[in-house]
Amino acid sequence: KIHDHHVGIISHLPHVISYSLVNSTLKEENKRNILLLAAGSFSGMARIAKSNPQMWSDIFKQNKDNLLEAITSFKNELEICENMIKNEKWDELKEWMETARALREIL
């Protein structure tokens, strides 16, 4: 149970994010121009979306509850980021980023 919770966060959620990023990019009107600009950050994140859809849809189904919790948590963080940008809270945004950057000390 704990294992399923953890892999929902560190393995399954990144796949959801990657598929979402690529799908939202492909919906852009000038997607070809955008993709020509794609560099390391996008390519690294988009690489995961090249994974086998059958396999990953089965994994998502198997770990549905934990994955939904992870998605909710991610959406909350995304809203926090969105609000800081919208309200021009640049110092708070920088602190929020620094908090995430601390991961490099763990990994």
PLM regions with names:
Residues I17-R32, I59:
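N-terminal glycine-rich phosphate-binding loop for ADP-containing cofactors
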Residues K31-A100:
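Interdomain hinge/lid region at the active-site interface
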Residues G8-S11, H15-V22, S43, R47:
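Generic alpha-helical structural context detector
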Residues I106-L107:
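Amphipathic alpha-helical coiled-coil segments
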Residues K1-L13, R32-L35:
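Conserved Rossmann-fold dehydrogenase catalytic segment
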